[in-house]
Each structure stands twice: as structure tokens, then as C-alpha cells.
């Protein structure tokens, strides 16, 4: 059987799994639709959040912009991550405390102002459409590669799938499908890392492999550590002036 047929089978099974989870966890109340009923286990929430972070609009895009723009691209990474942390710490807990489902509802009731509510709606729309544009583009690129269709068709396929389980299951369905997505993603990320670490250092644990020596062609230690090799990569990419610590912060940003 050709590789393309196996790809179609794998994609079909994964889609069926996500749709099955959405049907199983479909929302039966307004609270379940907006906040998954408030009863999702913290570990499951963490897995869903991690899967959302490892998506086309965040992790892949951040890696891409750093690859194309070099050190200047890290500004977007710090802003994205910092804003995410601030949102999780300063806003999300109070939504639950006030019993609200959306940020505009919380802002409007917190400041007793419909004008503030309108501003929050406008900001939410701008942020959401910006995020969705990147996410859907990434989905289209992935589907165009795997299903051998054009990017526009891939975008529409992704939209139909997301629309199905989002409308049917709400946040509850999305959360549990993201948990399944996390399992797929973490497997896809860890397997290459484990085998690369095993091939380069002879240690199957990537975190421990950082302190090991790079193996030579005969499988013996070369006397050069992995960290030294990574430092050499930083120098080759032009990051040395910003990581060696020999200049002041003012000089680096000037």
C-alpha cells in the first residue's frame, strides 16, 4: 500500500477520534458550553492548554518568525508568552469568581459600563481574528501537505471539522479533543527528541543528553559536549553578541 493511503487512513482515524470525543462530551447546558461545566481536572486543563500552545498560530509560528528574523523575532515570543501568563493570572481567575463566561461580560459588570463592555468586545474580536487567521492558515498548510490539496481547500476542511465539534460540544468538547491532541503532539515531539539524543549521545533521555559528549562515527565520546555544540550553533546564527554577556543591555538594544 502506498504511503499516501496510509496517510489518509491515519488522518481519517484521528478525525473520527476527535469527532467521537466531541459527541461523547457534548455540552448539555450553557455552563458546559462556555466553561466545560467548571469540572475539568486541572491536569486535563493543562494538557488542553499545552496542545493549544503547540499549535500553528503559536508554537510553529513563533519558531518560524525566529528562524526568519533571528534575534529580533524573539520579541514576539516574549510578548506572546508574557501576555498569556498575564491573562491566566490576572483575568481568568476573576471570570470564575464573578461567574461570567466571557471577558466583555466581566469587564462590563466589573466597571458598570456598557462602553467598557463594547471596548472589550472590539479588542476580543481583533485578537480572536488575528489568532484564527494564523491558526487556519497553519491548518491549511498542514492539510495541503498531507492530503495533497491546495491550501484554501485545507482551510475549509479544517473549518468544517472545528465547527462541528465546537458547536456540538462547546468548550467541554474542545477541551477533551485538545487533550487527545496533546497526546498526539507530545508523542510526535518526544519520539524524534529521544532518538536524536540516543543517536548523538547514546542517552535516550534528552534532558540528560545535554550534559553528555557527542559520539563520533565509532560510537565513542568525541570529547565535545552537546552544550558546546549548541553554543557553536548560537555563534553561527549570530546570537553570540547577545548571549556571551560581555556587553551591557544598553549596547545590545542600541
Please tell me what each predicted stretch does:
Residues 19, 50, 74-169, 222-241, ...:
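Helix-loop-helix module between adjacent transmembrane segments
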Residues 25-29, 33, 67-70, 94-102, ...:
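Membrane-interfacial segments
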